[in-house]
């Protein structure tokens, strides 16, 4: 017979929460074996899930689906057929079709999504470590600053080149010259394309133009002004496709994030499907890594032979990675350097171009925004500005950029963190340590309590004290 203890299953400390004192074998002799086994298995499953639910530390958190406390299947289904921002956005919608949202929602057995500014500040300002999900962004089998999950590893890698990303360096005459020269070439390219296509009434595909410009800027920032790509010079044809091989292989970062292989690797790594089906990665990933490795080895050869080595090291991120040594005098391996640098170059390949493409579209569709920009840039200030400091003179331009960044979702995945020891409380909901918690800019930027009429493009909303956001 079965005997349960204690009466309150939530206080049970062992599994199963019952003891078998004796079994009457005659009962099994009278009952068919398949029926007995099926009954025993069914009872065990019911008892197990009942025990899980009773002892569940997140039972008080609203859920994506009734099955969420027990399984990730509902989350995986919507993520596979849509994407993460759709999954979490729909989870936060308390009433379908209504603009009412739940600030904290459970989207997995041990995973919580946030749609609250206070929660974002707690998680991303509270030094929470990254979840293992980030390891999908490693390259060449090595982690980089973005894919490191531990804060210590992340900080140690960041210290190598942090000076390159200081505002004082980004706003330096050297970096400004890099950016302004590529923008000037971009403007000339667009003007020429408009003149050539004016009689053909054929649209100009601006995304490829913006991708080429961004890659030219980021590679010059990574290496040195004289050793970056010149992809703006390789564009041709009605859709401005590049003739350069590198331009095509770098599209891996645009395509692969939307392919099933990324889903299997990031959402279900325990199945090892990618390792079984594409052990060396998808062809696009292999091509991107092969092209980038050749680029990095070529620049290392230049560093070894150049009489201006010290200046090249000072100017670029890769030079610092190449010459860095740890306390034992050991350098980073080539794979470590390549993984880091490919992440730096690839990270902005699609994000900046998508943001600029969205802004171009919105401004083109908004004659009133165009008129206000012309008034501010050309009439009030004569269209003259030479440094980044001059941009502070243009509050409406700043508002247009901020509104574009608010609405465009260039990074549509949420950024999971792990609740540290001791747990935390968000929106009066306690989350125990080890809980995976995260948010998406897409969600917070569409919260009507913060941004009224959130889907509308309204730059004027930023012409106030931004601290209110």
Curated annotation (Swiss-Prot):
Name the UniProt record assigns to this protein: Cytochrome P450 monooxygenase-like protein avaF
Protein's GO biological process: secondary metabolite biosynthetic process
Keyword Metal-binding annotated: no
InterPro entries linked to this entry: Cyt_P450, Cyt_P450_E_grp-I, Cyt_P450_sf, Cytochrome_P450_monoxygenase
Keyword annotations: Membrane, Transmembrane, Transmembrane helix
PANTHER family noted in UniProt: CYTOCHROME P450, CYTOCHROME P450 12A4, MITOCHONDRIAL-RELATED
Membrane topology (UniProt): Single-pass membrane protein
Keyword Chaperone attached: no
Paired cysteines (S-S): none
An example molecular function term from Gene Ontology annotations: heme binding
Role: Cytochrome P450 monooxygenase-like protein; part of the cluster that mediates the biosynthesis of a highly modified cyclo-arginine-tryptophan dipeptide (cRW). The first step of the pathway is perfornmed by the arginine-containing cyclodipeptide synthase (RCPDS) avaA that acts as the scaffold-generating enzyme and is responsible for formation of the cyclo-Arg-Trp (cRW) diketopiperazine. AvaB then acts as a multifunctional flavoenzyme that is responsible for generating the cyclo-Arg-formylkynurenine DKP, which can be deformylated by avaC.
A GO CC term attached to the entry: membrane
Pathway the protein contributes to: Polyketide biosynthesis
Transmembrane segments: 34-54
Pfam families according to UniProt: p450
Subcellular location: Membrane
Domain of life, source organism: Eukaryota
Annotated family: Belongs to the cytochrome P450 family.
């Amino acid at each position: 017979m079965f005997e349960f203890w204690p009466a309150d299953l939530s206080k049970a400390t062992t599994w199963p929460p019952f003891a078998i004192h004796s079994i009457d074998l005659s009962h099994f002799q009278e009952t068919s074996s398949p029926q007995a086994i099926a009954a025993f298995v069914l009872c065990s499953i019911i008892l197990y899930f009942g025990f899980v639910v009773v002892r569940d530390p997140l039972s008080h958190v609203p859920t994506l689906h009734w099955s969420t406390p027990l399984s990730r299947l509902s989350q995986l289904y919507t993520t596979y057929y849509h994407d993460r921002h759709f999954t979490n956005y729909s989870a936060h919608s308390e009433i379908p079709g209504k603009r009412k949202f739940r600030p904290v929602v459970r989207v997995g057995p041990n995973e919580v999504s946030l749609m609250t500014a206070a929660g974002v500040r707690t998680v991303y300002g509270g030094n929470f470590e990254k979840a293992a999900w980030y390891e999908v962004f490693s390259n060449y089998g090595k982690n980089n600053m973005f894919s490191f999950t531990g804060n210590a590893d992340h900080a140690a890698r960041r210290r190598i080149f942090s000076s390159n990303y200081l505002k004082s360096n980004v706003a330096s005459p050297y970096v400004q010259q890099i950016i302004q020269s590529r923008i000037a070439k971009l403007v000339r390219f667009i003007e020429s394309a408009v003149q050539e296509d004016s009689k053909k009434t054929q649209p100009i595909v601006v995304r490829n133009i913006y991708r080429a410009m961004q890659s030219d800027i980021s590679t010059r920032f990574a290496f040195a002004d004289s050793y970056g790509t010149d992809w703006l010079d390789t564009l041709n044809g009605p859709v401005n496709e590049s003739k350069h091989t590198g331009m095509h292989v770098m599209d891996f970062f645009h395509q692969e994030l939307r392919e099933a292989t990324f889903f299997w690797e990031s959402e279900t790594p325990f199945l090892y499907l990618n390792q079984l089906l594409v052990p060396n990665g998808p062809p696009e990933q292999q091509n991107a890594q092969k092209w980038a490795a050749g680029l990095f080895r070529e620049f290392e050869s230049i560093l070894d032979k150049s009489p201006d080595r010290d200046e090249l090291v000072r100017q670029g991120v890769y030079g610092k990675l190449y010459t860095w040594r740890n306390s034992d005098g050991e350098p980073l391996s080539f794979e470590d350097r390549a993984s880091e640098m490919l992440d730096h170059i690839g990270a902005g390949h699609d994000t900046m171009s998508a943001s600029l493409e969205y802004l171009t579209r919105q401004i083109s569709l908004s004659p009133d925004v165009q008129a206000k920009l012309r008034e501010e840039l050309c009439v009030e200030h004569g269209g003259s500005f030479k440094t980044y400091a001059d941009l502070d003179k243009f509050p409406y331009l700043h508002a247009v950029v901020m509104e574009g960044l608010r609405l465009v979702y260039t990074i549509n995945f949420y950024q999971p963190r792990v609740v540290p020891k001791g747990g935390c409380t968000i929106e009066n909901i306690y989350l125990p340590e080890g809980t995976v918690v995260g948010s998406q800019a897409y969600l917070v930027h569409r919260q009507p309590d913060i941004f009224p009429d959130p889907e509308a493009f309204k730059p004027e909303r930023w012409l106030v004290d931004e601290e209110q956001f």
